[in-house]
Amino acid sequence: MINPNNRTMLVDGDILLYVCSTQMEEPIKWDEDTWTLHASERKTIDKFADTITYYSQILLCNNIAIALSSKTNFRKKISPLYKYGRRNNRKPLTFAPLREWVKKNFKTYEMPYLEGDDVLGILATSDMIKGDKVILTKDKDMKTVPSTIWFMQGDDYTIVDEDTANYNHMIQTLTGD
């Protein structure tokens, strides 16, 4: 039987921040030639909070830990071309203020030079957080971590044992993913 008081939802914060802030952007056409985007910071915060509540109820988790990416990244030190193709992609309008709100209102984990999914892997496999843990993400790369995962786009758990996680990691390594 699942004990919600001994169960933590490990949230892929980067993905959830991006999804919520993108969903709340609204385009407005002012005239034949002028478009703008606007977003309500309050509505974006409410969307994020509602999403956390929704999944914590489904997953029976009373504890929430949100993993965030560091501003610095060791992969960029190794290869300056890492995610180079994304350099011109803008962040959604309310991404930065939502991130700050999340840091003030939830238990967040951020580690120097690591991305949020790296932090999720550490939290899922270490004793930093006690009890049962469920990763909430959309990122298929989490299948390289021995853990219990709930993919936001699905409706069931994925349980990844250590052998399967190692296999998935090697496949990604060999295919350059």
PLM feature segments, named:
Residues 1-100:
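Domain-level signal for Mg2+-assisted phosphodiester chemistry and nucleotide/NA-binding surfaces
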Residues 2-6, 34-35, 61, 85-177:
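Extended two-metal-dependent nuclease catalytic cores across DNA- and RNA-processing enzymes
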